[in-house]
Amino acid sequence: MNTETTQDTTEAKLPGERLREARERLGLTQQTIAERLCLKITTVRDIEDGTTPADLAPTFLRGYIRSYAKLVHLPEDNLLPIMDKQAVPKAISVSPMQSFSLKKSRKKRDGWLMIITWLVVLVVLGLTGAWWWQNHQAQQAEINSMVDHASSMQSQTEGQSVPLMDNSAPQETSTAGSAATPPSTPVDLSATIAATPSTPPSSTTASSAAPSSQSPSQANATQSQAAGNALLGAGAVAPAATVADSNPVSAAHALVMTFTADCWLEVTDVSGKKLFSGMQRNGSTLNLDGQSPYQLKIGAPAAVQIKFQGKPVDLSRFVRSSQVARLTLTAE
């Protein structure tokens, strides 16, 4: 009777308690057991306390207990069944099985995302096109208003009467005056001949060689004619010199425009005077000479080639943007 009670009490003890008692009977410490079994002292303590480490698999735990039992001379066949009875089964977490509907819903979500993306792209493209169309319409309206203004100004100019001057009477008076001037003004014949080297020497020699065959009135007429020719020669030389002097000034402000298509144009000089405002046809050339800097407005920059002071003017930036060209040309 006492033997059965002792066996039941022994079996009721946990494997860890039995291992601890056996270790104490042998006079061993936990550190000694850990060193002999090559375990951590915390693992030995958990085995004796009956605590299963969370990071330790049951298979390794059974192996550690078997080695511990052999070390303290306990039958391992009695410890392992007790451990299996008292072990608490772990709850196995089973992941829910994914159905095919999840993949289908993901595809559906991706489809909606693509639709929204394409809608955003289409809205951006539409806004860009609307912005470009508004700018194009504004430019066309501005060009049309400029053309209408130029046409109205041209019609007003054509409607005004321009008086015509009759230059025949002044020419006759001038001719008569020039003819009457030599007799009233004494002219030195020798000085006149010296001032006009273009007069042929033969005529002078012939006139001086035969003085006896001319009357005094004829001699006076000859002298008057020679003096008139000298004055006309001097008058012809003076304007030529004036034109030659004025050419550098004109070249410094010369503006030449050649048109390859119909184009509206407006040119204003530094004083605010409009040198030109209207349409120019294909193949025409416009030469302007005023006071720089010039203010230019060109409706179709691609249809005009500009030279200022003999140098071409670059209009490529206006041609690329298809805008009305507004630029200022300043003399160097």
UniProtKB/Swiss-Prot annotation:
Start-end of Polar residues biased regions: 151-160, 168-182
Subcellular location: Cell inner membrane
DNA-binding region: 30-49
Membrane topology: Single-pass type II membrane protein
Coiled coil (UniProt feature): none
Keyword line: Cell inner membrane, Cell membrane, Cell shape, DNA-binding, Membrane, Signal-anchor, Transmembrane, Transmembrane helix
Gene3D superfamilies cross-referenced by the UniProt entry: lambda repressor-like DNA-binding domains
Ranges in the topological domain labelled Periplasmic: 133-332
Short name of any one Pfam family annotated for the protein: HTH_25
Record's function text: Cytoskeletal protein that is involved in cell-shape control through regulation of the length of the long axis.
Record remark: domains: The helix-turn-helix (HTH) motif in the cytoplasmic domain of the N-terminus is involved in the formation of spirals to maintain the rigid rod shape. As this protein is anchored in the cytoplasmic membrane, the HTH motif may contribute to protein-protein interactions to form the RodZ helix, which is localized beneath the cytoplasmic membrane. The C-terminal domain may be critical for determination of the rod shape by probably interacting with enzymes required for synthesis of the peptidoglycan layer, including PBPs in the periplasm.
Protein name as catalogued: Cytoskeleton protein RodZ
Source organism: Pectobacterium atrosepticum (strain SCRI 1043 / ATCC BAA-672) (Erwinia carotovora subsp. atroseptica)
Gene from which the chain derives: rodZ
